[in-house]
């Protein structure tokens, strides 16, 4: 690369050097734009379970029907709110939460009877990326009755027992 000295003592670079500098600037700008994508709503991942199974034991909820919700959370503020919310408060306030924060969460609901099994297909939870997912079960006994789902792929199995439930994810 040849530098040229101008009459006022300022050095200027050759066309090749200028093109190199411009290419470096464009590459840095592109890197900044791509890094910004995570900041404008591309965080999280898609809920892509191959199957979701809800299984109620014969003595579930003291032999009574039970409401169950799978909740998908799209932002960190809603995640913080739901992470501490017991199921009783979720079921009492879910309509208000959804109407106030329609882009922050979505959910699917079922009411199962003892001994029932529900198999859901892989398209039951399609939609925007999520940062977290929870299962809430509306048992009448005190307690959180909330489980955070750790994986967003494979099979999801929710086992509902007499007064508690568990969530297992398998490949």
Predicted segments with their positions:
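Glycine-rich, aromatic-bearing surface loops/beta-hairpins
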Residues: 41-43, 132, 140-171
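Helix-rich interaction surfaces within compact, conserved domain-sized segments
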Residues: 118-140, 146
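N-terminal Sec signal peptide cleavage junction
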Residues: 36-37
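Early exported N-terminus immediately downstream of N-terminal targeting peptides
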Residues: 54-88
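Bacterial N-terminal signal peptides that target proteins for export
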Residues: 4-28
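Contiguous beta-strand segments within globular domains
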Residues: 46-54
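Tryptophan-paired
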Residues: 84-126
């Amino acid at each position: 690369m040849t530098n040229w000295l101008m009459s006022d003592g300022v050095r200027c670079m050759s066309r090749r050097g200028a093109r190199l500098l411009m290419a470096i600037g464009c590459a840095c700008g592109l890197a900044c734009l791509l890094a910004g994508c995570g900041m404008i709503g591309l965080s999280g991942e898609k809920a892509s379970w191959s199957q979701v199974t809800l299984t109620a034991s014969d003595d579930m909820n003291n032999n009574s029907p039970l409401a169950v919700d799978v909740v998908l959370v799209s932002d960190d503020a809603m995640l913080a709110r739901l992470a501490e919310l017991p199921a009783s408060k979720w079921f009492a306030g879910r309509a208000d939460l959804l109407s106030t924060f329609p882009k922050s969460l979505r959910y699917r609901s079922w009411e199962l009877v003892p001994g029932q099994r529900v198999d859901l297909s892989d398209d039951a939870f399609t939609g925007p990326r999520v940062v977290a997912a929870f299962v809430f079960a509306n048992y009448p006994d005190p307690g959180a009755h909330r489980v955070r789902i750790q994986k967003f792929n494979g099979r999801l199995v929710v086992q509902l027992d007499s007064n508690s439930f568990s969530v297992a994810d398998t490949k």
